[in-house]
Amino acid sequence: MKVRASVKKICVKCKIVKRKGIVRVICETPKHSQRQG
């Protein structure tokens, strides 16, 4: 899980999800998981 100011899709399987006002990127590759903060 990476915490970044700007979250972007890295690959085709990345999905942008909004949970409780937090923008997240969910992917099969754990390295691609991101959270905005």
Curated annotation (Swiss-Prot):
Molecular-function GO terms, alphabetical: structural constituent of ribosome
Keyword annotations from UniProtKB, A to Z: Ribonucleoprotein, Ribosomal protein
The keyword Electron transport belongs to this UniProt entry's keyword annotation: no
SUPFAM superfamilies, A to Z: Ribosomal protein L36 (SSF57840)
GO BP annotations listed: translation
Domain of life per record: Bacteria
PROSITE patterns: RIBOSOMAL_L36
One protein family per Pfam: Ribosomal_L36
A cellular-component GO term for this protein: ribonucleoprotein complex
Record InterPro entries: Ribosomal_bL36, Ribosomal_bL36_sp
Protein's UniProt keywords contain S-adenosyl-L-methionine: no
NCBIfam families: rpmJ_bact
Family, as annotated: Belongs to the bacterial ribosomal protein bL36 family.
Protein name: Large ribosomal subunit protein bL36
Organism (species): Citrifermentans bemidjiense (strain ATCC BAA-1014 / DSM 16622 / JCM 12645 / Bem) (Geobacter bemidjiensis)
Taxonomy of the source species: Bacteria, Pseudomonadati, Thermodesulfobacteriota, Desulfuromonadia, Geobacterales
